[in-house]
């Protein structure tokens, strides 16, 4: 059976998929969404591990529609997974989004036909759906990163990944637990499980740089008392800042400020909680290595004072940083270091010598054996393109996305790809995923997407494809910004980009400049795209 009476197919029911379906449907387009989980929520439906919560500044982690707040009140400054799922249920009630989604089904392939100028999406059960426009909204947190460690299948205890936490997971209370990874999910699970585990061993690839989650109690109370109009104004202002959170960096270079004044400013930003120290610090934090080290040294002094164990102190907060401060998104914490300083918690550095083996009851590393009853992988996800690659997409002439990106990701505006007409991916590689509030990025992308599709319909455009030249131009624009920062000092490389000696660059110019690029494309006659009109294709 093939579902054919569609204008657009959306894959994924997280923030981007929900908003795309809602906005396109409002414009009168016939839209069908597919989601592998049983309900709306995206990563929040899947990430059910203990301690899972939002770490973004309040009130910016929500849909930018204050009307949703007429009968909704946030109960937490940093909403837990449970509250986020209630929020998605509320959105569904107001927008009736589930009516346009089929749940519990995965997409196994997607292919473009030059004959029909339509996409055919194949589902895992063999059914198909066809539409003019194909919109993968799978983000970059959909394919798990699980290290291949010999002996995993022999382990007699429980093995979990934070992004695939089962509803029937055993309690960690009184257990000997191993946590592999100290990224955002690792930081959250260490704080929750560390309080109840009999013993916890943390396997650390690199030290996590963290910031205080909360500022003053008054700050929390004020945030939760915001009215719908207050939210509307905050969200409006957020879209006018580079990071989408309303944070504005101090318009001075670090070393131009006397040291006493500098430290006083650092203290204010540090105590403000959230990402104020990172996003509202001096403007050259991520451009100047000396300025960056100055900020790190202040943070390290404050943080090292919280750790009594000398060995742990050097592992967790080394005097010389492993990488520049802020080029990896800082995690937010409440009592992380106090928990890791406890005698029942052990930290093992695996930066130079990886885990050797998992046995029936233990993990072997550095010639020692760590007995455990549960292993938690807090190892995150694949690279930013892994979600798109997992859909097995084929474009013009049957070209596979994996082959088109064999030497690394290439795109136009971080949304479109040459040889893949009428396909726009949302919140994926080469858009502002690193430094900007995700709902803000998604908001401007979906606004632009709706304008593009509407313009094509009005103009009689049946095929719209990014040019190969636009890839080069976007790469050049990204590089001009990227090379001025410290991000290149710790750039991630996938296996493919490492072989090609290419960095996995992304857009680090922030939201305002990115939005301007999208607007310029529209204003300049769909710059970077080639269009085919109905009359032209009829002659082919």
From Swiss-Prot:
Cofactor(s) the record lists: FAD
EC number: 1.14.13.-
Uppermost EC category: oxidoreductase
UniProt keyword Cytoplasm present: no
Site (Transition state stabilizer): residue numbering on this chain: 329
Binding site for NADP(+): 53-55, 182-188, 205-206
Bound cofactor: record note: Binds 1 FAD per subunit.
Pathway assignment: Alkaloid biosynthesis
Biotechnology comment: Loline alkaloids show broad-spectrum anti-insect activity, and different lolines may have different biological activities. In vitro tests of NFL, NAL, NML, and semisynthetic loline derivatives with long carbon-chain acylations on the 1-amine have shown that many are effective against both fall armyworm larvae and European corn borer larvae, but the effects seem to differ depending on the modifications. N-Formylloline reduces the weight gain of fall armyworms by deterring feeding, and does not significantly affect corn borers.
Binding site for FAD: 43-46, 55-58
A single GO molecular function term of this UniProt record: NADP binding
GO BP term (any one): alkaloid metabolic process
Domain of life the protein comes from: Eukaryota
This protein's UniProt keywords: Alkaloid metabolism, FAD, Flavoprotein, Monooxygenase, NADP, Oxidoreductase
Annotated Gene3D superfamilies: FAD/NAD(P)-binding domain
Induction entry: Expression is induced in loline alkaloid-producing cultures as well as in planta.
PANTHER family named in the record: L-ORNITHINE N(5)-MONOOXYGENASE-RELATED
Protein family membership: Belongs to the FAD-binding monooxygenase family.
Protein's job: FAD-binding monooxygenase; part of the gene cluster that mediates the biosynthesis of loline alkaloids, potent insecticidal agents composed of a pyrrolizidine ring system and an uncommon ether bridge linking carbons 2 and 7. Lolines are structurally differentiated by the various modifications of the L-amino group and include norloline, loline, N-methylloline, N-acetylloline, N-acetylnorloline, and N-formylloline.
Protein name per Swiss-Prot or TrEMBL: FAD-binding monooxygenase lolF2
GN (gene name): lolF2
């Amino acid at each position: 059976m093939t579902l054919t009476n569609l204008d657009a197919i959306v894959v994924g029911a997280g923030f981007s998929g929900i908003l795309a379906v809602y906005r396109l449907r409002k414009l009168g387009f016939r839209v069908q969404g597919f989601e592998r989980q049983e309900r709306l929520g995206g990563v929040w439906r899947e990430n059910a591990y203990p301690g899972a919560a939002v770490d973004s500044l309040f009130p910016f982690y929500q849909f930018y529609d204050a009307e949703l707040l007429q009968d909704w009140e946030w109960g937490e400054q940093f909403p837990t997974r449970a509250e986020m799922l209630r929020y998605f249920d509320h959105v569904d009630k107001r927008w009736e989004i589930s009516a346009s989604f089929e749940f519990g089904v995965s997409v196994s392939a997607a292919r473009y036909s030059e004959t029909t100028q339509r996409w055919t999406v194949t589902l895992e059960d063999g059914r198909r759906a066809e539409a003019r426009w194909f919109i993968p909204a799978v983000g970059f947190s959909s394919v798990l990163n699980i290290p291949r460690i010999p002996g995993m299948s022999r382990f007699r205890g429980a093995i979990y990944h934070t992004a695939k936490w089962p509803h029937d997971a055993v309690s960690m209370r009184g257990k000997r637990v191993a946590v592999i990874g100290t990224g955002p999910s690792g930081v959250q699970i260490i704080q929750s499980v560390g309080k109840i585990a009999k013993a916890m061993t943390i396997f650390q690839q690199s030290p996590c740089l963290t910031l205080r989650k909360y500022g003053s109690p008054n700050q929390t109370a004020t945030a939760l008392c915001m009215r719908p109009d207050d939210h509307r104004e905050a969200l409006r202002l957020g879209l006018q800042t580079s990071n989408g959170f309303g944070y504005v960096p101090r318009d001075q270079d670090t070393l131009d400020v006397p040291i006493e004044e500098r430290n006083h400013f650092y203290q204010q930003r540090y105590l403000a909680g959230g990402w104020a120290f990172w996003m509202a610090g001096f403007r050259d934090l991520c451009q100047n290595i000396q300025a960056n080290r100055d900020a790190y040294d202040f943070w390290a002094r404050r943080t090292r004072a919280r750790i009594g164990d000398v060995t742990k102190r050097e592992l967790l907060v080394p005097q010389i940083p492993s990488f520049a401060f802020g080029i990896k998104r800082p995690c937010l914490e409440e009592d992380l270091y106090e928990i890791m300083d406890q005698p029942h918690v052990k930290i093992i550095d695996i930066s130079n010598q990886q885990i050797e083996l998992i046995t029936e009851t233990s993990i072997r590393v550095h010639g020692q054996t760590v007995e455990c009853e549960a292993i938690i992988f807090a190892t995150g996800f694949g690279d930013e393109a892994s979600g798109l690659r997992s859909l097995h997409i084929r474009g013009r002439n049957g070209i596979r996305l994996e082959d088109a990106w064999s030497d690394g990701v290439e795109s136009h505006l971080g949304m479109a790809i040459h040889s893949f007409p009428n396909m726009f991916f949302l919140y994926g590689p080469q858009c502002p995923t690193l430094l900007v509030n995700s709902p803000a990025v998604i908001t401007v992308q979906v606004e632009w997407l709706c304008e593009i599709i509407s313009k094509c319909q009005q103009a009689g455009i049946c095929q719209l494809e990014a040019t190969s030249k636009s890839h080069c131009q976007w790469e050049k624009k990204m590089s001009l910004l990227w090379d001025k920062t410290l991000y290149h000092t710790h750039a991630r490389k996938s296996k493919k980009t490492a072989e090609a000696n290419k960095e996995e660059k992304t857009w680090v110019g922030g939201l305002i400049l990115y939005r301007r690029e999208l607007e310029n494309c529209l204003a300049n006659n769909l710059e970077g795209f080639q269009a085919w009109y109905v009359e032209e294709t009829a002659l082919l």
